[in-house]
Amino acid sequence: MNHLPEKMRPYRDLLEKSAKEYVKLNVRKGKTGRYDSKIAGDPYFPKHETYPTDENGQPMKLLAQINFSHIPQLDGYPSSGILQFYISVHDDVYGLNFDDRCEQKNFRVIYFENIVENDDELVSDFSFIGTGECDFPILSEAAVEPVKSSEWVLPTDFQFEQYTGMETMEFFGQFGEDEEDIYNELAENGFGHKIGGYASFTQHDPREYAYKEHTIMLLQIDSDDDIDSMWGDVGIANFFITPEDLRKKDFSNVLYNWDCS
């Protein structure tokens, strides 16, 4: 559970109502198997499926892969199947459309519900992606170790107001000269790589103004020297989905965002 700053302790009961489970992804550089959960590397991909391409017809690269059979179960998320996140390697903003963050032209989210277990039926050579001179935020393939945990709502997440009953800046303003320190101390809890839980941002939550139904975080990938991950100037990336779309296992309207300081 989150570390709670001393002056925030009177609000513990409010924050406890926001508790949400998530899966923390501990990462390490290294080769991964095609069925493994991973960051970067080569995907599980059946030969009979159409490989994702960007708006210019160029193959996209795997950003992350989640094998739900290999991670602790989260309420509402699939219990099996493989979920993949791809982004264009020929786009200097890593596939993000600032005007429509759900438009999957230069990023793609793919879910394989039924897994092909015959290796002969899977793509094994991904040299066609051509990443020699590419724009991609992660330089090293990484294996993940999933650990289930829980956290309270973060001040960076637009849902913070729902639990405190006050606008975020108004809430922290009551701490006077300690406002910034307390905000930063609480926000620090939310960084890192994870599935589920609440989102961290270096700028602001785009769901504060639109996409308010995208309340569930599918994935967060942070800047991380250990795996040569760098989103702009030490930024962070998130993918969100609506509860209804997640229930239907429909990943066509996923919200993608990344920002940096």
From Swiss-Prot:
This is Uncharacterized protein YwqG. Pfam families: DUF1963. It comes from the Bacteria. SUPFAM superfamilies: Hypothetical protein YwqG. PANTHER family: SLL5081 PROTEIN (PTHR36436:SF6). Gene3D superfamilies: YwqG-like. InterPro entries: DUF1963, YwqG-like_sf. It comes from Bacillus subtilis (strain 168).
